[in-house]
């Protein structure tokens, strides 16, 4: 072996295989690009992005760790989302959850606290 050398095994690696996935259409209605990282709670993404936030609750982009998706102004993209795993807790970000994703206080038919579909900025 040569110092620093690495050897790859034949075949491919499937990221996020077996995870429940859904597709959502996203439109950037803002005047600036928006970039969302791989593990960001998608429902809390920039309000300039128009999409079904309720459906995206508890989900992240189905892309490799450390990567991101970029939405230019006016862009319309379809992205795949998967459920957040682990302890399923979200803290910070846009402060919409700040705790466990499951067992929240949402009422049937009502948006979850902090996850409103309307844009709240100018």
UniProtKB/Swiss-Prot annotation:
Pfam families attached to this UniProt entry: Urease_beta
GO cellular component: urease complex
GO MF annotation: an example: urease activity
Compartment(s): Cytoplasm
Keywords for the protein's UniProt record, in alphabetical order: Cytoplasm, Hydrolase
InterPro entries for the chain: Urease_beta-like (IPR002019), Urease_betasu_sf (IPR036461), Urease_subunit (IPR050069)
The protein's annotated pathway: Nitrogen metabolism; urea degradation; CO(2) and NH(3) from urea (urease route): step 1/1
Reaction equation(s) it catalyzes: urea + 2 H2O + H(+) = hydrogencarbonate + 2 NH4(+)
E.C. numbers: 3.5.1.5
Top-level EC class as recorded in UniProt: hydrolase
Disordered: region residues: 102-122
Oligomeric and partner information: Heterotrimer of UreA (gamma), UreB (beta) and UreC (alpha) subunits. Three heterotrimers associate to form the active enzyme.
Protein name: Urease subunit beta
Native species: Paenarthrobacter aurescens (strain TC1)
